[in-house]
Amino acid sequence: RQRQMCIRDSGSSLLERFLDNASEIGRTVICVGSGNEGAARGHFAGNITRDGRVELAVGNYERNLNIQLWKNYSDVFRIRLQAPGGEEAELSTNIQGGKYTLELEQTRILVYLGEPLPYAVAQEIYLDMIPAEGSYINAGIWTIRLEPVVTVTGQYYLYLPAGSGIGESTGFYRATPQVTLTIPSTAAKVITVGAYDQVYDTYADFSGRGYADSTRTIGVAAAGLTKPDLV
């Protein structure tokens, strides 16, 4: 089963490394689809200089929603989360135990702070939003504000669950389709295949993709890859 690419997925996960090793045996060629997250509005990438502001639309009748924020461990951000009604709270990134709970309006937010892992240069801050009252979380525009305190790379990435896990009305207003590959298409030695729209004679908008950019040091770009390899 494919899943959306997280920032640390730069070809170093167990599955990706297995496919890379397998491709070196004999005349083995492994092809992998790039996924269908290209137009899902579930991914956002930015490079913070002063203040970063990300708006997330949450549709009606969402029973829960999780948000992954990935950044370099060396970067320190001040992060604030604002609910649709205007109530806001600052997210602490230095809590003993690495997890805590807060409430904004009728939504309870469980915050989990990632720890260092082998091969990982990125930290995950995981937000799990569930109803505090009623059956659904607050619908409307949620705003995430990031203010740099210590900046090394300044890069940050936000991910929502895969398209089938959320409603069609839920997504980032300024989504970034260039970070939408799914594992294992991020493996370095496989041939990643994207989708082609023969009606419009162009790359299919739903097809996942990733980029190589020397100014970015997290994810597929860290490995110096541009995916897909073939359409």
Task: Name what the model sees in each region.
Residues R1-Q4, R8-V231:
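Loop-rich non-cytosolic ectodomains and luminal regions
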